[in-house]
Amino acid sequence: MSLSRLSIDAFRNIDSAQLAPGAGLNLIYGHNGSGKTSILEAIYFLGMGRSFRSHLSQRVIQNDADCLTLFAVAEGQAGDSRIGLRRHRSGDTEVKIDGEKVKRLSQLAEALPIQVITPESFSLLFEGPSARRQFIDWGAFHASKQFHLAWMNTRRILKQRNQLLRDGASYEHIAFWDKELIRYALEVTAIRNDYVGSLNGVLKGIIGEFLPDVDIRVSFTRGWDSKTDFSELLQSQYARDLAIGHTVSGPHKADLRLRVGNLPAQDALSRGQLKLLVCALRIAQGKLLKQQIDKHSIYLVDDLPSELDAKHRQLLLKELIDTGAQLFVTAIEPSAIVDSLPVPPDRMFHVQAGRVTQTK
């Protein structure tokens, strides 16, 4: 999957821009605040229906505009897809794929698998289990057609169960929902566990290249004691759940644990090593996606040189290029990227005050 055409209108500080990206590495350069990160953000918005920089999507619409408009032509093995999105200041969103209206944003994610590597990518390690569950679920969603529905049903039932707990319902009333919760929770957990197992096989080789002297162990925790039957646990923890008004254990508490020796990776590694670890995780996801469903991710890499020396910058770029995926990489100075590449970028774009000019 790669974008052969990209149009951006009224997005952040970009009035209007049309790009014809290459299928390989696209280097976007310019001063801080010029709008280069906004191009990455626009691609992400088109693929996810939201920003990777702000949950308040209205902020991405230019102040004097009523809406933003994004359009792309995506090339894949099955042919080209035309994807369009319009977000109004009211919050209403219109999405079309090949002229057909899209009802669920998950259809966007399926059409455009996107990986993001930014200075904020550390959140995967530092912001608690939620970010790591999202990481697992991105892969599980693409790997299994059953995952999305199973997870949506799990969330729906958990919401109903938690409301009953807050209402002080007896366990007899909650037991009905627990039967359904157990069914979907076990399905979600099995898919997640299989996915992390597959990811581990790909990840080891990449970590071996990035951090050859560090023994990193990656494991999946399902959200409750692995030795305890989930049905028995829900019943035995009913009094506790009732007291605090929500379900303490379950797939909504799952996590991806990364450890070096007896320490969490975030306590054992330097910031540069942590950045390489996060990059390795993202690259592994993209490689596994290609193996499982024969589809490339699109990589959005913002401020790649940050906290990496020339050797590791070169190594990271090589691994990214070796995925065969389309890459969008930003830098203040193009030489910071070009000097680390074995071959020139496919395309280069200069951004100044929201204006985009192709220079190669």
Swiss-Prot record:
Pfam families: SMC_N (PF02463)
GO cellular component: cytoplasm
Binding residue positions for ATP: G30, H31, N32, G33, S34, G35, K36, T37
GO molecular function, one term: single-stranded DNA binding
PROSITE patterns: RECF_1, RECF_2
Source species, domain of life: Bacteria
Compartments reported by the entry: Cytoplasm
SUPFAM superfamilies, per database record: P-loop containing nucleoside triphosphate hydrolases (SSF52540)
InterPro entries reported for this sequence: DNA-binding_RecF, DNA-binding_RecF_CS, P-loop_NTPase, RecF/RecN/SMC_N, RecF_2
Record key words, sorted: ATP-binding, Cytoplasm, DNA damage, DNA repair, DNA replication, DNA-binding, Nucleotide-binding, SOS response
GO terms for biological process, alphabetical: DNA replication; DNA synthesis involved in DNA repair; double-strand break repair; SOS response
Keyword Cytoplasm (UniProt): yes
Record family assignment: Belongs to the RecF family.
Protein name listed in UniProt: DNA replication and repair protein RecF
Species assigned in the record: Shewanella amazonensis (strain ATCC BAA-1098 / SB2B)
Organism phylogeny: Bacteria, Pseudomonadati, Pseudomonadota, Gammaproteobacteria, Alteromonadales
Gene this protein is translated from: recF
